[in-house]
Each structure stands twice: as structure tokens, then as C-alpha cells.
């Protein structure tokens, strides 16, 4: 549901514009799995055909992707190529400090950080661009030495607030509880 509500819908509304970017910090799944899940949703919405990401990989026991389904996947290639342009996925382990450093590096591709006499500011290359920063999910952040899990989450939240205020990004933080 998170993928559909917070990623897929905004993505589809903006996929053909240069004014939209998603930086996805995927602590729960690899980039390939994320893209395949998005492709599965896209195929359902576009073709009315349900093909799970495991079926797309032919990893479901006793299942082989049919020629018809393979043709559908091939027809989705332009969409997948555009998806890779719009969504940048970081799928390695992270702590709050590493997250902040990575986001500063990524945001430098879309603008510049400049020092004024009183503070550091961000000047976007395209002021109309919306950048979603998705952290999925925050409980999987690694603790840095000397910090508790709560302190790590609090620090990551504070970093995201700083980036929201300085750079105008829209953070989406996913937290799951069992």
C-alpha cells in the first residue's frame, strides 16, 4: 500500500515531466525488487493483468512467464527506462549520518549549496522540481556507535527536516510496526 499511495500515484502523475524526482532510501528491499513491484502495479493499472514481481522474475514455484506476459513486459520497457530516470534508489545499509551525506550528494546534482554570511543555502537548478525523499523504513536504520535506536531515528528525522527547510524536498518516512 505504501508503494501505491506514496510512490506510484505521484510518480504516474509526474513521470513525463522534468519537474519530478524521487530519491528512494530502500532499507527493506533491493532496487530490482522495488522496480519490479512498481512494474507489477503498472501492468495491473495499464493492462488489467496481475503479474507479481516473483512471476516477473519466473521465481514462483512451478511458474514460467508466458509469451503473452513477456510481450507485455517488453511493451513496458519505455516506462521502465523512464522510471529509472525519475527514481534513484539507495539500497544499502544506512545510519542517520550516512543518510544525510548521501542526500547532500544527491541533491548537489539538482542544485548547489552556497554559504551566506549567516547560513548555508541551497539554490536549485530547477525551482519548479519536486523532489520526494522516501525513507523505507526508518526502523531499519543502523545505530551509529554511542546512539540508541531512538536517538538514530530522531537524528534522521532532524536531518530530513533540515533538508526540507533548506532544499525544499518532500520527505516521506515509512515506519512499520508489527
Feature-to-residue mapping (PLM):
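Cytosolic-facing regulatory segments adjacent to core modules
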Residues: 12-128
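P-loop NTPase motor core
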Residues: 1-20, 26-27, 92-178
